[in-house]
């Protein structure tokens, strides 16, 4: 996938963060929808004794236990698909990181689930940023993330959740951000 869009002029650095509108979520949402509807129709065909599918005839299946199992899998697959498409439409986790020297603030913004916390926005003064920290763990569960390290020893993650970014991309983003803010880059 492409690197996140990073726009910069001399005083403002803004990085767009990709949320749930990723190709993998769209792919699995579609697969779960097709599979869930297929199993649901197969289970209903078994119960109603009427063929509701184009590709095969499941009306001859015994409803208990085969038909009810197909119905259960269909409901589960359809529910998973609805959840995935709900998060895709709302772009959960999407947002931006903005470092603004004009206002002297860093703003981390993300979209959340509906409710009082739909808009998640956190702002800190640029003066509170001590360093940019890169966290790299290789192995079975690879972890590559960038954090802002604040004076209160608090760390705010900057990278998106999901597929880890490449090591060179992490280094480039971290170096550009550290250079822009005039703080050290730690962890590399």
UniProtKB/Swiss-Prot annotation:
<keyword id="KW-1133">Transmembrane helix</keyword>
<keyword id="KW-0793">Thylakoid</keyword>
<keyword id="KW-0602">Photosynthesis</keyword>
<feature type="transmembrane region" description="Helical">
    <location>
        <begin position="26"/>
        <end position="46"/>
    </location>
</feature>
<comment type="function">
    <text>Seems to be required for the assembly of the photosystem I complex.</text>
</comment>
<dbReference type="Pfam" id="PF02392">
    <property type="entry name" value="Ycf4"/>
</dbReference>
<dbReference type="GO" id="GO:0031676">
    <property type="term" value="C:plasma membrane-derived thylakoid membrane"/>
</dbReference>
<feature type="transmembrane region" description="Helical">
    <location>
        <begin position="70"/>
        <end position="90"/>
    </location>
</feature>
<dbReference type="InterPro" id="IPR003359">
    <property type="entry name" value="PSI_Ycf4_assembly"/>
</dbReference>
<protein>
    <recommendedName>
        <fullName>Photosystem I assembly protein Ycf4</fullName>
    </recommendedName>
</protein>
<keyword id="KW-0472">Membrane</keyword>
<keyword id="KW-0812">Transmembrane</keyword>
<dbReference type="GO" id="GO:0009522">
    <property type="term" value="C:photosystem I"/>
</dbReference>
<comment type="similarity">
    <text>Belongs to the Ycf4 family.</text>
</comment>
<dbReference type="GO" id="GO:0015979">
    <property type="term" value="P:photosynthesis"/>
</dbReference>
């Amino acid at each position: 996938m492409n690197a996140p869009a990073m726009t910069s002029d001399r005083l403002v650095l803004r990085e767009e963060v990709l949320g749930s509108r990723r190709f993998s979520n769209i792919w699995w949402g579609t697969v779960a929808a097709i599979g869930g509807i297929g199993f649901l129709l197969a289970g209903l065909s078994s119960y109603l004794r009427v063929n509701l599918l184009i590709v095969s005839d499941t009306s001859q299946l015994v409803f208990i236990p085969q038909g009810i199992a197909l119905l259960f899998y269909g409901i589960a697959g359809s529910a998973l698909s609805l959840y995935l498409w709900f998060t895709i439409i709302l772009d959960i986790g999407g947002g931006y990181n903005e470092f603004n020297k004009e206002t002297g603030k860093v703003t981390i913004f993300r979209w959340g689930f509906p409710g009082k916390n739909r808009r998640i926005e956190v702002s800190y003064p640029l003066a509170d940023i001590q360093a940019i920290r890169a966290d790299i763990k290789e192995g079975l569960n690879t972890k590559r993330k960038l954090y802002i390290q604040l004076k209160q020893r608090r760390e705010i993650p900057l990278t998106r959740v999901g597929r880890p970014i490449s090591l060179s991309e992490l280094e480039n983003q971290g170096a550009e951000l550290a250079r822009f803010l005039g703080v050290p880059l730690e962890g590399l």
